[in-house]
UniProtKB/Swiss-Prot annotation:
Residues 167-188 have a biased composition (Basic and acidic residues). Residues 805-898 form the GED domain. This is Dynamin-like GTPase msp1, mitochondrial. Residues 1-78 form a transit peptide. One of its GO terms (molecular function) is metal ion binding. Keywords: Disulfide bond, GTP-binding, Hydrolase, Magnesium, Membrane, Metal-binding, Mitochondrion, Mitochondrion inner membrane, Nucleotide-binding, Signal-anchor, Transit peptide, Transmembrane, Transmembrane helix. Cleavage of the transit peptide by mitochondrial processing protease (MPP) produces a long integral membrane form of msp1 (l-msp1). Further processing by a rhomboid protease after the transmembrane regions produces a short peripheral membrane form of msp1 (s-msp1). Both isoforms are required for full activity. The chain crosses the membrane at residues 86-103, 198-214. Residues 167-198 are annotated as: Disordered.
Length: 903
């Protein structure tokens, strides 16, 4: 705009001479022209020079004037400058446009990266919450999601580059604002158009150079570079420690005592009342450890601290205890106390650890193990060797590669510290030991400083002095962070004593220094053992794969698949049972039961009658006595409650068959599964029992009043009655032979003769035989009488007197058998519909519901563990899966460490 304005002004001034020299067509003399031109020259304007450059306004402007062109060497520089002014301005505009386009492209790229980063962060957090919810409800582990590697490389979404981009963007914005201010000042101060044009080009060139320089790291100062490197290192350390703790938790799930893979942890040891619990609680920021006058820490507490920036409310979770997320740390303290006090005082300590994981945004990623404190004297209710048990338990945990955190009280001589003596036995050089001196405010500052100087009992990581006394609960609310309160108290104490102002011991004072030291030492130890741990996991995995291939032929098995396979086998056997147990089998079952009932009625009401022999011989005689006997037998048979009797008989038979099928199935090794199956069968049978028995009773109700038998039924029943009597006769003869063989025929004859004499004698005979022998003789007499009656009745049934149905009173055996047939046939029809069909349909589905859909993961694991062979297979398979996952994670960490070292 400034150039256009200048050119327009220049054109107007070039037109002025011609209009001045020749207004309204008049012609001036040369003297007049020279006089007017000289006046214009004094004002700084040269009309002839302008005319010579741009030409006259009109072709006849100077036709009548004798003009003289003035030329000097000073006009050469101005001519060159004016000829280069337009190209320079165009180049400046092009450069400025290119710089503007580049800046807009960079802004679009950064905006796209931020959008991708935020979007993936939201998706990642949402999916993580979904995984936790599904895992807590169904115990199903959903897969993790991660951004593809190629997209990470494109977007540069790793931790270090993201931080570097944020710093560079801030520097770019700052310089852009400063450049804008400088350019605005220069445009306001410059009046000359030439200087304005040059200033625009210089500003555009400077903006191009500034954009190029901002993209590199050369614009950062040395302090900013160190700060950026330190922040990147801390982020990398935090990420590395968190991943290693995840690997440690994975390896802990293996539960194999023979595993040689161990990851470093910080083991806290010290004497009772040395302040171990206070130090741990100050690190965590909450009171959660058990406290008491007696020894309350009786089991190792494996404490895992997880830094979770998204966690607004800290919470804890116990491994192996289904308590969920616990946000009340007093409840955590109560649970820890109960778990520790579950160990009886007579036992002292138990090496079964308590695993607790705490998630919070203000805690570092650490793996700590709190052990029972060393004691000097045991109480009466404690074992005499309690001190030895505690020492052995501590030595088990303070072995390599664990880090030893030896807690000592400042008011106790270090020479008497049990923690330092124990650490010297396994770490003579003190390379893995960190000394923590508690109660620094109870000793003079000079003595405290002498301890921290690390001269008498040197340790590689030195001693860190803390106070860490728990502030009384009444002075702060439960929501306050204990770490901040302890740090404030420590800073107040150390700042009031000038002896602690020495810069050499400044990094060895306070709980914050201890936290930093623990983070650095744990990260260094884990990093140092990273390759060794990866090799150990790889070796363990190879051995596990070999054992799994040899023992189980690489056959993958899960609790769900095992139960499904077992159910398939059971259902196949059950289907075979349904084909073998139908109406005909139920009919035979009921018929057999009613036959026994008929035999009992005949034996009770006919065969014990003294007149049975005469009645059998005179079959044509009809006597009301015998008619009443038959009617009473029929009434008893029809009113016996056939519905319940038959239904109960069938349900018992089904239950027995189901029990036999279960014992022959893969569930025979699982008592709980057998109980599930039997309960399912009994529940269905119980639900159908009432309806079935009612239907059967209603259908046999007409037979309670009248029973009609046709000729075919009589004929069929006659043959069946003969068979029943023949079977009964065979049983009777078998019993006779058994008694004779047991006693002897000769002696039995003597006993029978003695019984006959005793029966006919008016006076009691001397006891020549034992009571048991006499009982055998009386049984033999009864069986002989029964044998004679059965033979007599069989002969009657075979005679012509029992040929027709009108002889039902003469041949009650045939008629009662016909009645039982009618009852059985009627009952079978409704039992088949109401009981068998429903049971065969519902039972397999009930098994699926109870054994597949209703069991939790814990119940499935408990169910599978009942089979020793299956338990060992699943444990080996779980170990292989955990090792594969751990190896995958640790290999990625190895690659990241190598890249970090190369950078």
């Amino acid at each position: 705009m400034g150039i256009s304005w200048f050119l327009s002004r220049f054109r107007i001034r070039t037109v002025a001479p011609s209009s001045f020299l020749k207004p309204r067509g008049l012609v001036y003399r040369p003297s007049q022209i020279r006089r007017r031109v000289s006046l214009l020259s004094l004002s700084g304007f040269h009309p002839y020079r302008a005319y010579s450059i741009l030409g006259p306004k009109t072709p006849t402007a100077f036709n009548s004037a004798n003009t003289v062109r003035f030329f000097s060497f000073s006009s050469i520089s101005r001519l060159v400058f004016r000829s280069l002014r337009l190209p320079v301005a165009g180049f400046s505009l092009v450069a400025g446009g290119a710089a503007y386009i580049g800046a807009q492209v960079q802004r679009a790229s950064d905006y796209t990266k931020d959008i991708f980063d935020k979007t993936f962060g939201i998706l990642d957090s949402t999916w993580e919450k979904t995984r936790e919810t599904v895992a807590s409800v169904t115990n199903v582990q959903l897969p993790e999601i991660s951004m593809p590697l190629w997209l990470e490389k494109i977007l540069r979404l790793d931790e270090e580059s993201a931080e570097r981009r944020r710093v560079l963007q801030a520097e770019r914005a700052k310089e852009h604002r400063s450049n804008s201010n400088d350019k605005q000042k220069s445009s306001d101060n410059d009046e000359d158009p030439n200087d304005t044009t040059v200033g625009i080009g210089a500003a555009l060139a400077a903006s191009i150079l500034s954009v190029d320089s901002v993209d590199g790291e050369d614009t950062l100062t040395a302090d900013e570079k160190r700060k950026l490197a330190q922040e990147s290192k801390e982020d990398r350390m935090m990420l590395f420690t968190k991943k290693m703790i995840e690997i440690r938790n994975i390896l802990q799930d293996i539960q194999d005592n023979n595993s040689a893979v161990t990851l470093p942890s910080i083991v806290v040891i010290g004497s009772q009342s040395s302040g171990k619990s206070s130090v741990l609680e100050a690190i965590v920021g909450h009171e959660f450890l058990p406290k008491g006058s007696n020894m309350v820490t009786r089991r190792p507490i494996e404490l895992t601290l997880v830094h979770s920036a998204d966690t607004a409310i800290p919470y804890g979770e116990f491994s192996g205890v289904q308590l969920g997320k616990i946000t009340d740390f007093s409840k955590i303290q109560h649970i820890l106390t109960d778990l520790n006090m579950a160990v009886p005082s007579s036992q002292g300590v138990d090496d079964n650890p308590i695993r607790l994981t705490i998630y919070a945004s203000h805690i570092p990623n650490l793996s700590l193990i709190d052990l029972p404190g060393y004691i000097q004297i045991h109480s009466e209710d404690q074992p005499a060797d309690l001190d030895m048990k505690i020492s052995k338990l501590c030595e088990k945990y303070i072995r390599e590669p664990n880090i030893i955190l030896a807690v000592c009280a400042a008011d106790v001589d270090l020479a008497n510290s049990a923690a330092l003596r124990a650490s010297r036995r396994v770490d003579p050089l003190g390379l893995r030991t960190i000394g923590v001196v508690t109660k620094m405010d109870l000793v003079p500052p000079s003595k405290a400083i002498s301890i921290l100087h690390n001269n008498n009992y040197p340790l590689h990581y030195g001693y860190i002095g803390v106070i860490s006394r728990i502030v009384p609960t009444g002075r702060f609310s439960a929501g306050q962070n204990l770490t901040d309160l302890v740090s404030t108290q420590e800073n107040s104490y150390f700042s009031t004593h000038q002896q602690f102002a020495d810069a050499r011991i400044g990094n060895y004072l306070g709980i914050q220094s201890l936290r930093k030291c623990l983070i650095n030492v744990l990260e260094y130890t884990m990093s140092k053992n990273l390759q060794h741990t990866a090799d150990s996991i790889r070796t363990e995995l190879e051995e596990c794969n070999y054992q799994y291939k040899v023992q189980y032929n690489d056959r993958v098995l899960t609790a769900d698949s095992y139960i499904a396979e077992g159910l398939d086998i059971f259902k196949a056997a059950f289907k075979e049972f349904t084909q073998k147990f139908g109406k005909s089998e139920v009919r035979d079952l009921l018929k057999s039961s009613l036959n026994e009932k008929v035999m009992d009625l005949l034996a009770e009401r006919y065969w014990t009658d003294d007149d049975i022999s005469n009645w059998s011989k005179h079959t044509n005689a009809l006597d009301e006595h015998w008619k009443y006997k038959l009617d009473s037998c029929v009434s008893t048979l029809t009113r016996m409650g056939l519905g319940r009797v038959s239904t109960l008989l069938v349900t018992d038979s089904i239950s027995k068959c189901i029990d036999e099928i279960t014992k022959a199935s893969p569930f025979a090794d699982h008592p709980a599964a057998m109980q599930y199956i039997m309960n399912a069968a009994q529940d269905i049978l119980r639900r159908r029992f009432h309806a079935t028995s009612e239907q059967v009773e209603n259908c046999v109700k007409p037979y309670k009043y009248d029973v009609e038998v046709n000729d075919d039924e009589w004929k069929s029943s006659r043959g069946q009655a003969e068979k029943l009597l023949q079977r009964e006769l065979g049983l009777c003869q078998s019993a006779l032979e058994k008694i004779k063989n047991a006693v002897g025929s000769r002696r039995m004859n003597q006993v029978l003769q003695y019984l006959e004499e005793q029966k006919t004698s008016s006076e009691p005979l001397p006891a020549s035989y034992s009571t048991a022998l006499l009982e055998q003789g009386r049984m033999l007499q009864y069986l002989k009488m029964r044998e004679d009656i059965l033979k007599l009745r069989i002969s009657v049934l075979k005679s012509r007197a029992c040929k027709h149905k009108e002889a039902k009173y003469t041949c009650p055996e045939i008629f009662l058998n016909a009645v039982s047939d009618k009852l059985v046939n009627t009952a079978v029809l409704f039992i088949n519909i109401e009981l068998l069909s429903e049971f065969y349909y519902q039972f397999p589905r009930e098994l699926d519901q109870r054994l597949i859909h209703s069991l939790s993961s814990e119940q499935l694991n408990a169910f599978v563990n009942e089979n020793p062979r299956l338990k060992s297979q699943l444990q080996l398979q779980h170990k292989r899966q955990c090792l594969e996952l751990a190896l995958q994670k640790i290999n990625s960490l190895v690659i990241l460490e190598q890249q970090a070292d190369s950078d």
